[in-house]
Amino acid sequence: GVVIDIGEGVSKVRESDKVILTWIRSDGAECAGAKYQKGNTIINSGPITTFNNFTVVSENRCVKLPEGIPMDLAPLLGCAIPTGAGIIFNTIKPKHNNTLAVFGLGGIGLSAIMAANALECSTIIAVDIEDHKLKTAKELGATHLINNRDGGALDEILKF
């Protein structure tokens, strides 16, 4: 998004800066998540308040968008990539000869595929019900594809 206005003490971003909102805390001020009210319903929108046209966020949830990265790809940097790649690099930590299966090939799953490929996992199994997502997974490093539209993915995976 684009910074419309800043509050007192904000030094990390300026008005008109292009930014990525992320759930990963960085430096800068932290404040409570925003709340919105519609009639008698109060919505706690959390620390980054996504899916809005405008939002109020803590400075430490904004990262300036690096030059050369298009705005339409920026949202992937705030959630899908750190979640999908983060689970591979920081939690699973597979070795190059490990087999890994990823179920669901949205932004998070495809980011996990890319991370597993970067770690040179020998077998990366992509599972989804959409052929176009499986094709993308193959392009990003999946070694085996399973369309689970009719079930049976687990039986297929156990063959590896």
Residue ranges: model-predicted function:
Residues 1-28, 66-69:
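Glycine-rich beta-strand-centered segment in the early N-terminal region that forms part
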Residues 1-3, 13, 55, 65, ...:
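Hydrophobic packing within well-folded, soluble alpha/beta domains
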Residues 25-103:
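NAD(P)H dinucleotide-binding glycine-rich loop of Rossmann-like/cofactor-binding domains
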Residues 83, 108, 116:
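Hydrophobic/small residue at the entry helix of a nucleotide-binding pocket
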Residues 87, 112, 133:
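Conserved sugar-transfer catalytic core signal across GT-A, GT-B, and GT-C glycosyltransferases
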Residues 89-90, 114-118:
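Short, well-ordered alpha-helices that flank and scaffold nucleotide-derived cofactor binding pockets
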